[in-house]
Amino acid sequence: MDLIDEEKFSSEILDVYKKFVVMKQEAPDSMKVNLFTTIRNFAKDLISNKIFIEAFVLYRFLIVKSELIPDDYSTIAENLVKINAPKLAKNFMTIYATKEQNKVLMFLTLANFYNLQIGDYRKAIKYYEKYVEIDKTKAVIYSILGNLYSKVYGDSSISEQIFYFEKAYKLNPTSRLVLHALAFAYEKNRNQDKADKFYKEILNNNPTEIDYYNYGSFLISCGNFVQGHKYFRYRFLIDDENLKYPIDNSFSKKWDLVSDISDKTLLVHYEQGFGDTFMYCRFIPLLKKFARKIIFVVQDNLFDLIKNSPIISDGIEVLSDKTSVRNIYYDYDMALLDAPFVLKTTTTSIPYPQGYLTVNAPEVKTYASKYLKNKSNLKIGIAYSGDKNANYSGRDIDLKKFNIITNLENVNVYSLQVGSEIENPKIIDLGNTFNDFTDTACAIKNMDIVISTDNVILNLAGALGVKTLGLFNKQTNFRWFKTTGENVGWYNSVKPLQACVQDDWTTVFPQVVNILSEYHS
């Protein structure tokens, strides 16, 4: 009652409280039952309208004048959380658990309380699991359990997620949420057949543009480039800033990617990040057979490097994105990442896996004389952090994990990372010497080997044909369809090393050291 400011408090509710708080215990039972029911319903109406303090005043009346029913304790607890009294709320839920005789209802109420009100997801899992031991008929509860395991334990709980989502699927096989969950979980679990089954069920169940895009990405990750890139075209129909068509629709002249344009000028525009441009620019020369002329627009930081790489630029007009597309004459345009669809590329027909970008030897030599140390030591370039704005995370490695490499004898370790602070004095920072990607390429060409988890450096090193160890998390970006063997499929010079557990690199770095030791032998 100390919370009440009578000037601001609802006079109607205060009058009800004052009128009935003096009611005698010996009042007729029928009167008390009717009154308590009315008060209880009134309190719930107030709560539904988020009028919490007034509702608690009425519950106080019930506490004083009647014996609360179990539902009262849980209702009070849930709404104490809303006025920032979680400790008191938990006390009421403890009392509720002793009062509620219906075990199924009790476990569900406790589970929902800890899940939705407190955010103690581990406790929520405990009570939901007790619930499904008794009632095995609710698909939504199994689905909640699958999602909670994902939220609390991440990819280490894939088996539990699949177990509960499969239970939900058996009870409700048309639930799009469950189908999505199973497709994603099986994809993460490397069970491509099962993932494909559920993706196909999604596409037969009121599919959206993002469903087609997700399926396309999945197929690409499986190495099914032809079908994957067909569905991948749906990305531009999704409301996602990272997936926008690279040319403004108000003046774009989109090619449908199939009609004859042999007598036309085709403008190919980069999309997404630097790594994507490095990876996909290899397709530009092959597009010459489709159009009379090809114009290739790239990010300004990449312009000099690509312009001066003959495999890509011979017979191609390469332009910086500083040039407004409005001022370029052309007939049709397309996005760079659609090139594999146009070319019907397969994993065995990826062009130029040996490399296709070049820098002039004198520039490479000049860079070395300026910035590199003992030339007789093994020169190792490292990149350990990905773009924070990219669609995919999981590419960051604590720089301290590279100490096992910097402690090796007769090595010089160079950071190729831009804008990072390096505390290890054994790591030489080259990032602040990079004005554009020609500088980065010169640094990479001077390395005996590059070790990278960052897509930009990984793709650039591969495109330059430099020996590289690609460090891949357990969950990788869909473009990397091959993460075993001696190369990644895209580049002959890039050897993949993959974590067995997401974000756990303990098995990867010993492999790195073993490979580096071969260079000393």
Question: How should each PLM-predicted stretch be described?
Answer:
Residues 1-449, 454-521:
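Alpha-helical solenoid repeat scaffolds of the TPR/TPR-like class and their adjacent stem/linker regions
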